[in-house]
Amino acid sequence: MNRAVFEFNRVTDRVILKPLSSVYITVVPEAPRQGVSNVMRNLREPWVFINDLLQFKLDRAGATLGRFIINSTVGVAGLFKVSDEVGIPYHSEDFGQTLATWGIGDGPYLVLPLLGPSNGRDAFGFAANVYADPVSLTLEEIDDSKKFFDLSMTRTAIEAFDARVRLHTTLDELYKEDDPYVVARSVYWQRRRFEIYDGNPPEPEEDIFDMLEEEQAAIDAEEAQPENKQ
Protein backbone atom coordinates (compact mmCIF):
# COMPACT_ATOMS: atom_id res chain seq x y z
CA MET A 1 0.00 0.00 0.00
CA ASN A 2 2.78 2.45 0.91
CA ARG A 3 4.52 1.88 -2.42
CA ALA A 4 1.24 2.45 -4.27
CA VAL A 5 0.69 5.76 -2.48
CA PHE A 6 4.32 6.72 -3.09
CA GLU A 7 3.84 6.09 -6.81
CA PHE A 8 0.63 8.13 -6.77
CA ASN A 9 2.52 10.99 -5.13
CA ARG A 10 5.31 10.72 -7.67
CA VAL A 11 2.90 10.84 -10.63
CA THR A 12 1.03 13.76 -9.07
CA ASP A 13 4.31 15.56 -8.55
CA ARG A 14 5.45 14.95 -12.12
CA VAL A 15 2.13 15.96 -13.70
CA ILE A 16 1.06 18.86 -11.47
CA LEU A 17 3.42 20.00 -8.72
CA LYS A 18 6.72 20.00 -10.57
CA PRO A 19 5.39 22.02 -13.56
CA LEU A 20 3.74 24.51 -11.20
CA SER A 21 6.86 24.91 -9.08
CA SER A 22 9.02 25.26 -12.21
CA VAL A 23 6.82 28.11 -13.46
CA TYR A 24 6.84 29.71 -10.01
CA ILE A 25 10.64 29.55 -9.81
CA THR A 26 10.99 30.96 -13.33
CA VAL A 27 8.49 33.81 -12.96
CA VAL A 28 8.96 34.88 -9.34
CA PRO A 29 12.41 36.22 -8.32
CA GLU A 30 14.26 34.55 -5.46
CA ALA A 31 13.78 37.40 -2.97
CA PRO A 32 9.95 37.30 -3.03
CA ARG A 33 10.01 33.50 -2.92
CA GLN A 34 12.22 33.63 0.16
CA GLY A 35 9.85 36.18 1.67
CA VAL A 36 6.93 33.78 1.28
CA SER A 37 8.96 31.01 2.92
CA ASN A 38 9.89 33.33 5.78
CA VAL A 39 6.29 34.39 6.40
CA MET A 40 4.99 30.81 6.42
CA ARG A 41 7.73 29.77 8.83
CA ASN A 42 7.04 32.74 11.08
CA LEU A 43 3.35 31.83 11.26
CA ARG A 44 4.40 28.43 12.63
CA GLU A 45 6.46 29.94 15.46
CA PRO A 46 3.61 30.12 18.03
CA TRP A 47 2.99 26.38 17.54
CA VAL A 48 6.72 25.70 17.82
CA PHE A 49 6.70 27.72 21.06
CA ILE A 50 3.83 25.64 22.48
CA ASN A 51 5.59 22.39 21.62
CA ASP A 52 8.80 23.68 23.19
CA LEU A 53 6.83 24.18 26.41
CA LEU A 54 5.12 20.80 26.14
CA GLN A 55 8.57 19.22 25.91
CA PHE A 56 9.82 21.30 28.88
CA LYS A 57 12.50 22.91 26.71
CA LEU A 58 12.26 26.30 28.37
CA ASP A 59 15.44 27.77 26.88
CA ARG A 60 14.31 26.87 23.37
CA ALA A 61 10.83 28.21 24.13
CA GLY A 62 12.34 31.54 25.12
CA ALA A 63 14.39 31.63 21.93
CA THR A 64 11.32 30.80 19.84
CA LEU A 65 9.26 33.55 21.46
CA GLY A 66 12.06 36.07 20.98
CA ARG A 67 12.49 35.06 17.34
CA PHE A 68 8.76 35.40 16.67
CA ILE A 69 8.58 38.87 18.24
CA ILE A 70 11.67 40.13 16.38
CA ASN A 71 10.66 38.76 12.99
CA SER A 72 7.04 39.87 13.36
CA THR A 73 8.05 43.46 14.17
CA VAL A 74 11.47 44.38 12.83
CA GLY A 75 11.17 41.68 10.17
CA VAL A 76 7.88 43.12 8.85
CA ALA A 77 5.43 40.33 9.69
CA GLY A 78 8.10 37.72 9.10
CA LEU A 79 9.16 38.75 5.59
CA PHE A 80 12.76 39.02 6.78
CA LYS A 81 14.60 36.64 9.12
CA VAL A 82 16.09 39.32 11.34
CA SER A 83 16.45 36.78 14.15
CA ASP A 84 19.16 34.94 12.21
CA GLU A 85 21.24 38.12 12.10
CA VAL A 86 21.05 38.55 15.89
CA GLY A 87 22.00 34.96 16.62
CA ILE A 88 18.63 33.28 17.21
CA PRO A 89 18.48 30.50 14.61
CA TYR A 90 15.27 28.70 13.71
CA HIS A 91 14.51 25.24 15.06
CA SER A 92 11.60 22.97 14.26
CA GLU A 93 9.19 21.46 16.76
CA ASP A 94 5.82 19.85 16.10
CA PHE A 95 3.35 17.69 17.98
CA GLY A 96 4.79 14.50 16.52
CA GLN A 97 8.13 15.39 18.13
CA THR A 98 6.34 16.23 21.37
CA LEU A 99 4.67 12.82 21.43
CA ALA A 100 8.07 11.21 20.83
CA THR A 101 9.56 13.00 23.84
CA TRP A 102 6.61 11.74 25.89
CA GLY A 103 7.59 8.19 25.03
CA ILE A 104 5.09 7.47 22.26
CA GLY A 105 6.58 5.04 19.74
CA ASP A 106 6.88 5.63 16.02
CA GLY A 107 4.16 3.25 14.96
CA PRO A 108 4.06 1.85 11.42
CA TYR A 109 5.75 3.64 8.54
CA LEU A 110 3.18 5.38 6.34
CA VAL A 111 3.18 7.23 3.05
CA LEU A 112 0.33 9.73 3.08
CA PRO A 113 -1.34 10.91 -0.14
CA LEU A 114 0.25 14.20 -1.28
CA LEU A 115 1.98 14.65 2.11
CA GLY A 116 4.60 11.93 1.74
CA PRO A 117 6.50 9.91 4.40
CA SER A 118 5.12 9.72 7.92
CA ASN A 119 4.35 7.19 10.65
CA GLY A 120 1.46 6.42 12.97
CA ARG A 121 2.57 8.89 15.62
CA ASP A 122 3.45 11.69 13.21
CA ALA A 123 0.18 11.29 11.28
CA PHE A 124 -1.70 11.96 14.52
CA GLY A 125 0.71 14.79 15.25
CA PHE A 126 0.06 16.32 11.84
CA ALA A 127 -3.67 16.45 12.57
CA ALA A 128 -2.91 18.27 15.82
CA ASN A 129 -0.58 20.64 13.96
CA VAL A 130 -3.47 21.60 11.67
CA TYR A 131 -6.35 21.78 14.13
CA ALA A 132 -4.58 23.21 17.19
CA ASP A 133 -2.46 25.85 15.45
CA PRO A 134 -2.83 29.03 17.57
CA VAL A 135 -2.53 31.46 14.64
CA SER A 136 -5.47 29.95 12.79
CA LEU A 137 -7.50 29.72 16.01
CA THR A 138 -6.79 33.39 16.78
CA LEU A 139 -7.81 34.54 13.31
CA GLU A 140 -11.00 32.52 13.64
CA GLU A 141 -11.80 34.33 16.90
CA ILE A 142 -11.13 37.74 15.35
CA ASP A 143 -13.29 37.19 12.28
CA ASP A 144 -16.08 34.64 12.56
CA SER A 145 -16.63 34.77 8.80
CA LYS A 146 -13.41 32.86 8.27
CA LYS A 147 -13.91 29.11 8.33
CA PHE A 148 -11.24 27.56 10.53
CA PHE A 149 -10.92 24.36 8.51
CA ASP A 150 -10.63 26.24 5.20
CA LEU A 151 -8.04 28.60 6.66
CA SER A 152 -5.95 25.78 8.09
CA MET A 153 -6.11 23.77 4.87
CA THR A 154 -5.12 26.82 2.81
CA ARG A 155 -2.09 27.43 5.00
CA THR A 156 -1.15 23.77 4.87
CA ALA A 157 -1.41 23.77 1.07
CA ILE A 158 0.75 26.89 0.77
CA GLU A 159 3.35 25.40 3.12
CA ALA A 160 3.38 22.15 1.14
CA PHE A 161 3.86 24.00 -2.15
CA ASP A 162 6.58 26.16 -0.62
CA ALA A 163 8.35 23.00 0.55
CA ARG A 164 8.08 21.57 -2.98
CA VAL A 165 9.70 24.71 -4.37
CA ARG A 166 12.55 24.57 -1.85
CA LEU A 167 13.10 20.86 -2.57
CA HIS A 168 12.84 21.25 -6.33
CA THR A 169 16.30 19.92 -7.15
CA THR A 170 16.35 17.42 -4.27
CA LEU A 171 13.17 15.69 -5.44
CA ASP A 172 14.44 15.52 -9.00
CA GLU A 173 17.54 13.71 -7.73
CA LEU A 174 15.44 11.42 -5.51
CA TYR A 175 13.30 10.21 -8.39
CA LYS A 176 16.44 9.32 -10.36
CA GLU A 177 17.39 6.70 -7.75
CA ASP A 178 16.98 2.99 -8.55
CA ASP A 179 14.48 2.65 -5.70
CA PRO A 180 13.34 6.14 -4.65
CA TYR A 181 10.80 4.67 -2.21
CA VAL A 182 13.55 3.09 -0.09
CA VAL A 183 15.70 6.23 -0.25
CA ALA A 184 12.79 8.45 0.79
CA ARG A 185 11.97 6.15 3.71
CA SER A 186 15.57 6.14 4.92
CA VAL A 187 15.87 9.93 4.65
CA TYR A 188 12.60 10.36 6.53
CA TRP A 189 13.67 8.21 9.49
CA GLN A 190 17.06 9.92 9.71
CA ARG A 191 15.53 13.40 9.55
CA ARG A 192 12.92 12.65 12.20
CA ARG A 193 15.53 11.22 14.58
CA PHE A 194 17.63 14.34 14.00
CA GLU A 195 14.67 16.61 14.78
CA ILE A 196 13.40 14.66 17.79
CA TYR A 197 16.85 14.69 19.43
CA ASP A 198 17.51 18.34 18.53
CA GLY A 199 20.34 17.50 16.17
CA ASN A 200 22.08 15.05 18.52
CA PRO A 201 20.53 11.60 18.00
CA PRO A 202 22.03 8.77 20.05
CA GLU A 203 23.91 5.99 18.38
CA PRO A 204 21.39 3.33 17.33
CA GLU A 205 21.57 0.18 19.42
CA GLU A 206 22.26 -3.00 17.50
CA ASP A 207 19.11 -5.05 17.23
CA ILE A 208 19.32 -8.44 19.01
CA PHE A 209 17.88 -10.19 15.95
CA ASP A 210 20.56 -8.62 13.75
CA MET A 211 23.20 -9.93 16.16
CA LEU A 212 21.72 -13.44 16.08
CA GLU A 213 21.59 -13.40 12.29
CA GLU A 214 25.24 -12.35 12.10
CA GLU A 215 26.27 -15.10 14.52
CA GLN A 216 24.28 -17.71 12.60
CA ALA A 217 25.79 -16.55 9.32
CA ALA A 218 29.28 -16.95 10.78
CA ILE A 219 28.44 -20.47 12.02
CA ASP A 220 26.99 -21.44 8.64
CA ALA A 221 30.07 -20.13 6.84
CA GLU A 222 32.37 -22.09 9.16
CA GLU A 223 30.41 -25.31 8.73
CA ALA A 224 30.45 -24.90 4.96
CA GLN A 225 34.26 -24.97 4.87
CA PRO A 226 35.79 -28.41 4.08
CA GLU A 227 37.54 -30.10 7.01
CA ASN A 228 41.31 -29.97 6.96
CA LYS A 229 42.71 -33.35 6.13
CA GLN A 230 45.71 -34.62 8.09
What are the residue ranges of the model-derived segments?
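Beta-rich strand-turn-strand
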Residues: 37-39
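Acidic/histidine-rich, surface-exposed loop or edge segments in extracytoplasmic proteins
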Residues: 1-3, 18-22, 48
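Amphipathic, soluble alpha-helical interaction motifs
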Residues: 11, 49-53, 187
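Mature N-terminal segment immediately following signal peptide/propeptide cleavage
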Residues: 1-11
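Mid-length scaffold segments of soluble, non-membrane domains
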Residues: 42-120
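Membrane interface segments of multi-pass transport proteins and intramembrane proteases
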Residues: 15-31
